[in-house]
Curated annotation (Swiss-Prot):
The lineage of its organism: Bacteria, Pseudomonadati, Campylobacterota, Epsilonproteobacteria, Campylobacterales. It comes from the Bacteria. Signal peptide: none annotated. This is Flagellar biosynthesis protein FlhF. The gene is flhF. Residues 64-91 are annotated as: Disordered. Pfam families: SRP54. It comes from Campylobacter jejuni subsp. jejuni serotype O:2 (strain ATCC 700819 / NCTC 11168). Keywords: Bacterial flagellum biogenesis, Bacterial flagellum protein export, Cell membrane, GTP-binding, Membrane, Nucleotide-binding, Protein transport, Transport. Belongs to the GTP-binding SRP family. GO terms for cellular component: plasma membrane. It is a peripheral membrane protein.
Length: 484
């Protein structure tokens, strides 16, 4: 009885052992396995496996499965595109073919897994020696011939199998096929995009009446949709789109990317932001606004920014809020943690005294009581504090980004008698639309000073930036992305 050598292919290395056990039994020996086809977008990888088994063991395994030993036949001429694979396949039978090796007079005591690794990194498939295998040799070998041939073949196969990927020389025809496929795929995608654009233009023209006779070219459809979904007022959007269409150079109007850039630029110019400059004389900032917009938390963030930022100004705090015990205690706790002086002023006449006691501070932050924009008595009390002070006080109206436009305008109108200098917008992380903020600034023309973008003290505070706000208006707020 002789020894048989079989080859077969699988698409996954995890299939090798189960297939060997199923087809050849537990006594089969895996000589080697190698990848003969890399994985691509539309095809799985392919691995070739060589196994050896005694003919008697193979017959016994087949009997258990109710099968008989296949007839011996010569292997067909291979059609592999790799020179090394052609030579190996001329010696190694194809899938499900048997080779009988004559060991009748001699014992074989060798390890079929022996691998030599000399010059491993230098070997490619094309380096396989042509004199290693005689494609016309009879498949029945004597022991000496078999030992020599099998040793050489195993060595070369092992070198090919273990060749590093970076040293592998792919078949040029295969690369050309992939390149042609990519070109065809790109053409199909471009055709599909053209069809989508055509359909979008047709739908855009059909809906012209719904835009109140606002003649907007299809190239402006995307930016129009973004702006409309942001929540800005319809009349504001109409005015901006008209300005864009009328003033934009004709050569740019057919380019969607150019339209996007121009529209972004126009919005940035509409949104005034106060430039943060070095403090050369004492700066007093009073924060006013309705209940629940985050004035106290924002003041704590500002205190840390001025006291421990790049410039490190001497900073003090005054609170006029004696109604909300919890808020006052919270502010005192913040001041204690930051080691900043803090004074509470109960009566309007006491404000100037409090400011004088913090005369050594370069920045003084004043917290006020939060109240409804409709509570005229408390609003009048805040106005009284300002009237009794001779100091130059910068009044900052704090409003929340998640407040609808109608309420924002009510808040501004009822606080405007305090002579608002800037707007501070809070709670960026609690809304997805910012067109309401745009419309507020568009109507009031009050500059923006700071954005509170989250609840973390002191980190979630940004100096107002029109580019940042425009990005939020058109694309939404993403804390990890917008403030990079």
């Amino acid at each position: 009885m002789g020894q048989l050598i079989h080859t077969f292919t699988v698409e996954d290395t995890e299939q090798i052992i189960p297939k060997v056990k199923e087809d050849y039994g537990d006594k089969a020996l895996i000589i080697t396995n190698k990848q003969i086809r890399p994985k691509t977008l539309n095809r799985s990888a392919l691995y070739e496996v060589m196994v050896a088994i005694e003919e008697s063991d193979y017959e016994e395994h087949l009997k258990k499965q109710g099968k008989s030993l296949p007839a011996k036949k010569s292997s067909p001429k291979p059609s592999s595109t790799s020179l090394a694979e052609e030579k190996i396949r001329s010696q190694i039978p194809q899938e499900d073919e048997d080779v009988v090796l004559d060991f009748s007079n001699t014992r074989l005591n060798t390890n079929l897994n022996t691998v030599k690794n000399n010059d491993l990194a230098k070997k490619t498939y094309q380096d396989f020696p042509q004199n290693k295998i005689n494609p016309h040799q009879n498949k029945t070998l004597g022991f000496d011939d078999f030992k020599e041939k099998l040793s050489e073949v195993s060595n070369e196969i092992s070198k090919v199998t273990n060749t590093p990927l970076e040293n592998y020389t792919p078949n040029p025809n295969y690369n050309k096929k992939i390149e042609n496929f990519e070109k065809q795929f790109e053409k199909q995608i471009n055709k599909l995009n053209d069809k989508i654009d055509l359909l979008a233009d047709m739908m855009w023209d059909d809906k012209a009446e719904a835009r109140k006779n606002l003649m907007i070219p299809p190239e402006f459809a995307s930016i129009y949709k973004q702006a409309k979904e942001s929540g800005m007022l319809e009349n504001h959007l109409e005015a901006i789109m008209k300005a864009t269409i009328e003033n934009m150079p004709a050569a740019m109007k057919t380019n969607k990317d150019a339209v996007q850039r121009y529209f972004h630029s126009l919005l940035r110019n509409i949104l005034p932001c106060r430039v943060e400059s070095d403090i050369k004389k004492q700066k007093i900032m009073m924060l006013v606004g309705p209940t629940g917009v985050g004035k106290t938390t924002t003041l704590a963030k500002l205190a840390f920014r001025y006291a421990y930022g790049d410039k490190r100004y001497k900073t003090g705090i005054i609170t006029l809020d004696t109604y909300r015990i919890g808020a006052v205690e919270q502010l005192f706790q913040y001041a204690k943690m930051m080691k900043l002086p803090i004074i509470d002023s109960i009566e309007p006449k006491d404000l100037d005294e409090a400011i004088k006691s913090l005369n050594n501070c370069e920045v003084i932050l004043v917290d006020t009581i939060g109240n409804s924009q409709y509570d005229q008595s408390k609003l009048a009390k805040t106005k009284e504090f300002l009237m009794h002070s001779n100091a130059e006080i910068d009044v900052n109206l704090v409003v929340s980004a998640n407040t609808k436009h109608e309420d924002l305008m009510e808040i501004y109108k009822n606080f405007s008698f305090l002579n608002i200098d800037t707007l501070i917008i809070t709670k960026f992380d609690e809304t997805k639309v910012f067109g309401n903020i745009f419309s507020l600034v568009y109507e009031t023309n009050i500059p923006l000073s700071f954005f509170s973008i989250g609840q973390e003290v002191p980190d979630d505070l940004e100096v107002a930036n029109s580019d940042f706000l425009v990005h939020c208006i058109l694309e939404g707020f993403n804390k990890g992305k917008n403030n990079e």
